[in-house]
Amino acid sequence: MNKRAKSKNREPLRKSPVKRGDEVVVITGSERGKRGKVLKVLRNTHKVIVEGIKMVKKAVRPSQDNPKGGIVEKEATIAISNVMLASKWEKRQEKKKVAVEKKEQG
């Protein structure tokens, strides 16, 4: 078990609501409304890495892959509770739209 997950008294996820490759929408936070593809699900820490979301800059030492080193932009983790499947999100938005139209009509 991961130390970080252990310190928060969390059990690893048995069944994740999203899987690698799923299209998701961020539902809360500074990246709200943005879409992306799930690259990795971290079950021990209840987090996901989504393509193009929450980009951070990281200093990298020179290596064989990157002989110059420097600063690299990469995706950071997001809490799994802050993302929702895109299909589910669209259904939710459609439902809200219909409710608003009914309210306006009478």
UniProtKB/Swiss-Prot annotation:
Keyword list, A-Z: Ribonucleoprotein, Ribosomal protein, RNA-binding, rRNA-binding
Biological process terms in GO annotation: translation
Pfam families cross-referenced by the UniProt entry: KOW, ribosomal_L24
Record field: compositional bias (Basic and acidic residues): 8-20
One Gene Ontology CC term in the entry: ribonucleoprotein complex
Xref: InterPro entries: KOW, Rib_uL2_dom2, Ribosomal_uL24, Ribosomal_uL24_CS, Ribosomal_uL24_KOW, Translation_prot_SH3-like_sf
UniProt xrefs under CDD domains: KOW_RPL26 (cd06089)
GO MF term list: rRNA binding; structural constituent of ribosome
Keyword Phosphoprotein: no
Region called Disordered, residue ranges: 1-20
Subunit description: Part of the 50S ribosomal subunit.
Protein family: Belongs to the universal ribosomal protein uL24 family.
Protein's job: One of two assembly initiator proteins, it binds directly to the 5'-end of the 23S rRNA, where it nucleates assembly of the 50S subunit. One of the proteins that surrounds the polypeptide exit tunnel on the outside of the subunit.
NCBIfam families associated with the record: rplX_bact
Name of the molecule in the record: Large ribosomal subunit protein uL24
UniProt lineage: Bacteria, Pseudomonadati, Verrucomicrobiota, Methylacidiphilae, Methylacidiphilales
Gene giving rise to this polypeptide: rplX
